[in-house]
């Protein structure tokens, strides 16, 4: 019986991919653990700018390499999986690999925008304080 993820019968909808995946496979459990660790690093690196930049660059690089990872996984799926999940369109790897990484990257960008807004607000407050101190000297 061919797998539901074979290239000729690959499901078009995202719910079909999610429901037809055997989430108990060790490599998928490991991938889920990897995504949890990435999320934890995203959350705990908010005070360390260089670490967060490095983490962001790693996330973006992994997403960029997803097509190549998909090709290698499609050729060698029997070594680590019970089913052929990797199709030519990259739907499965996009859902289980790239999407969580992109969400982490989005969280980092939101944190950077928030930090930038806080700095801009602080800068404006400091300018207003400086102007307020300069006014009594002029009068």
UniProtKB/Swiss-Prot annotation:
Q: Name one Pfam family in it.
A: TMEM18
A biological process (GO) of this protein is: cell migration
Question: Residue ranges of region DNA-binding?
Answer: 113-139
Q: How does it sit in the membrane?
A: Multi-pass membrane protein
> Which residue spans belong to the Perinuclear space compartment?
1-25, 74-91
Q: Which residues form a coiled coil?
A: 116-139
**InterPro entries for this protein:** TMEM18
Q: What is the protein's major site of localization?
A: cytoplasm
Name any GO cellular component annotation. Answer: nuclear membrane
GO MF terms listed in the record are:
DNA binding
Stretches assigned to the Nuclear side = 47-52, 113-139
Q: Where in the cell is it found?
A: Cytoplasm; Nucleus membrane
Q: Which UniProt keywords apply?
A: Coiled coil, Cytoplasm, DNA-binding, Membrane, Nucleus, Transcription, Transmembrane, Transmembrane helix
Its domain of life reads: Eukaryota
List membrane-spanning regions.
Answer: 26-46, 53-73, 92-112
Motif Nuclear localization signal covers 130-138
Share what the entry says about its subunit structure, partners included. Answer: Forms homooligomers, independently of the DNA-binding domain.
Role: Transcription repressor. Sequence-specific ssDNA and dsDNA binding protein, with preference for GCT end CTG repeats. Cell migration modulator which enhances the glioma-specific migration ability of neural stem cells (NSC) and neural precursor cells (NPC).
Q: Which family does it belong to?
A: Belongs to the TMEM18 family.
Recorded protein name is: Transmembrane protein 18
Species of origin reads: Bos taurus (Bovine)
Q: What is the lineage of its organism?
A: Eukaryota, Metazoa, Chordata, Craniata, Vertebrata
